[in-house]
Amino acid sequence: RNVKGDILNGRVRSTNFGIWWDGDLLRELLDHERVLKYDWKAGRTYTLMQLKNCKFNNGTKSNPCLSADILGDWREEILTRDEASSELRLYVSTIPTTHRITCLEEDIPYRLGVAAENSGYNQPPETGFYFGAESKF
């Protein structure tokens, strides 16, 4: 709905995890072993990556073990377990980016969010600064 209460699109979208994945400055959606891109112009989502042979946690919510800027290129990686829970897997975007941004772990609110995600409240970390499509980095 918009600010007037008008319905903009009647289809329900994923609202599970946001993740910086594909190289632009918009967040993608991480939900049930898939990274999804929301095309706001077309009003639909499409799959960027299907994570194979892995398991997420908490059945209905489907949380990864961790999603964060682990490797330091500002885009976030996905840490999960395999189906047998015998190994950890780190999924990394292979999509090129032209943006050069400081490692998100250097931002204190982001780092605290990663610690909270990893130790209790499993929600994606947020930066302490505005990070969006029109940002100039």
Where are these regions (language model features)?
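Beta-propeller-forming repeat regions
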Residues: 1-137
